[in-house]
Every structure is written in structure tokens, then in C-alpha cells.
């Protein structure tokens, strides 16, 4: 099972119920439909350390070389 929610600005329907995915997230089966939605960026996985901020533009910080 996956706990997923719509990505920011997206509205995604469950293909079985035809209802919109809840903005706070829902448990869905790990099947090809939801895996494709994850890969396309239409939904995001909600983990135990949920971060609601949009991290798409956050780049890893470069480490400075010490001399």
C-alpha cells in the first residue's frame, strides 16, 4: 500500500471510485496506475516525516573544501 496525496495544484481521481484523491492523503494499492502517477509527479508519497513544503526547487548544498 502507498500513502499518497495530490501534488501541489493537482486534482487526481481514483480510477475505481472516480472520487478525487483527498488533499491530506489516502492509502492506495501499489499498482501500475498509482506508480505511473508518482513517476509523472501527479501525486507525492506521504511518509512518516511528512513535509508539506514544495521541495522541487531545492538543490543539495555543495560542501566547501577545507584546506
Swiss-Prot record:
Induction: Expressed in the late phase of the viral replicative cycle. Expression of late genes is activated by the viral late transcription activator C. InterPro entries: DUF2635. It is found in: Virion; Host cytoplasm. Residues 45-67 are annotated as: Disordered. It comes from the Viruses. Keywords: Host cytoplasm, Late protein, Viral release from host cell, Viral tail assembly, Viral tail protein, Virion. One of its GO terms (biological process) is viral tail assembly. Signal peptide: none annotated. May possibly stop tail sheath polymerization by capping the polymerizing tail sheath once it has reached its requisite length and prevent its depolymerization. Probably interacts with both the tube and sheath proteins. This is Putative sheath terminator protein. It comes from Escherichia phage Mu (Bacteriophage Mu).
Amino acid at each position: 500500500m502507498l500513502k499518497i496525496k495530490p501534488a501541489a495544484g493537482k486534482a487526481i481521481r481514483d480510477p475505481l471510485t472516480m472520487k478525487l484523491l483527498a488533499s491530506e492523503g489516502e492509502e492506495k494499492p501499489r499498482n501500475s496506475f498509482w506508480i505511473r502517477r508518482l513517476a509523472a509527479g501527479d501525486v507525492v508519497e506521504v511518509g512518516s516525516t511528512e513535509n508539506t513544503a514544495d521541495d522541487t526547487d531545492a538543490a543539495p548544498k555543495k560542501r566547501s573544501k577545507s584546506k
